[in-house]
Amino acid sequence: MLQIYNTLSRSKQVFKPIVPGKVKMYVCGMTVYDFCHIGHARVMIVFDMVVRWLRASGYEVLYVRNITDIDDKIINRAIENGEPISALTNRFVDAMHADSDELGLMHPDQEPRATDYIAQMQGMIGKLIENELAYQANDGDVNFAVRLLPRYGQLSGKTLDELNAGERVAVGDGKRDPLDFVLWKSAKPEEPADTRWKSPWGEGRPGWHIECSAMSCDLLGEHFDIHGGGADLQFPHHENEIAQSEGALYGKDRKVDDAPFVNYWMHNGHIRVNEEKMSKSLGNFFLIRDVLKSFDPEVIRFFMLKTHYRSPINYSDAQLEEARSGLVRLYTALAQGSKAQTISLGSSNPWAKRFADAMNDDFNTPEAIAVLFDIVSEVNRAQGEEKQVLANILKALGASLNFLQRDPTVFLQSSAKDQAGLSPEQIEEQIAARVAAKQAKDFAKADAIRKALLEQGIVLEDKPGGLTGWRRA
């Protein structure tokens, strides 16, 4: 039975979908004004894992992840570059998709862009004004009146007096209260024409928070199962989403029996660098495409999932090397089953049960990966057909996490991308020289080549028929 840690209740809860067998999930996506960094990769990988496990568990999942393609940062970057908003955002949407594909991740079922949902946003703002939860200020902006919603703060667990305006919630002259946040931004004379839309409140553009409320409600309904995102979005973004969505639907007072906007809120932990939160403002961030130049995509996914999704991760090349070494151990064991196949495992299989118990405990991937390493230990001890059976189980369980689906030989030889040192071509040249030395009965030279390769982290494996395989140690 799956349990999910729900940020709203601050506890693990048994997962009960609104419609049996079906799951509707929304994840806050990227603001597309620059290339994606490794923090974005964690969001992508974590919720890719969640969707894969839900589907492996038999659920029909509708996975929506939005694209924010109108935002102050986008506008500023477009002005700085002297290009239209659409040219900038399209370029970085393409780059995001390229990064995601390179990481080996699934595409969301729906990937709405904010600018395609302006009408829905305006409709929701209109309802909030009608419900006396929003007002137009003297500067032309339309703001949400936070103190008029008594239940505001339920996600962050803070009272109104404890809350701060937070990131992206600028306190403007027109606000009645510093906690109020903007729903519709009045157009400024210096802003480009492609950043404004007509509305009942004058030309302008949507605020950041209303975008996700409108898109999620339009695509998933006013009440859905799971909403996810990074921990930094819990407040104010997700808090404001709840306020807007429930305020538009129920007004100031949601009754006890009224369905909440979202049943389960999930938040992944931060990426840290030298024990500091990774962020562009600190200049300590790493682009996905740059990390991919040095590390295999599967290594990056493994690095992310060997830590529980709610815990922070300290990023370093050393940590990625450790992840690479772990994958090498798994693939080396898999290679011992010469014809390992992804098979269907029944729930009665003890390995499958242990793995499922871990994953059903709030997607506990570290514990699930520990099960894989326990199988590796058994593979190393097994003989004959039992090796093959265990290798099949290893591959089948790995598939649930998008691991171990490649040819082991190919993976073990392809880590030149992960390490400095000899290229596969150079290694094959040395192997050919060793074969020639053995044929000439110059065994001292053959042994010297083997030793030299081992010193550079290359392990040779002589096989029947005079063939020689290799892997990185």
Swiss-Prot record:
Disulfide bonds: none
GO cellular component: a single term: cytosol
Binding site for Zn(2+): 28, 212, 237, 241
Needed co-factor(s): Zn(2+)
Motif ('KMSKS' region): 277-281
Top-level enzyme category: ligase
Gene Ontology molecular functions: ATP binding; cysteine-tRNA ligase activity; zinc ion binding
Name of this protein: Cysteine--tRNA ligase
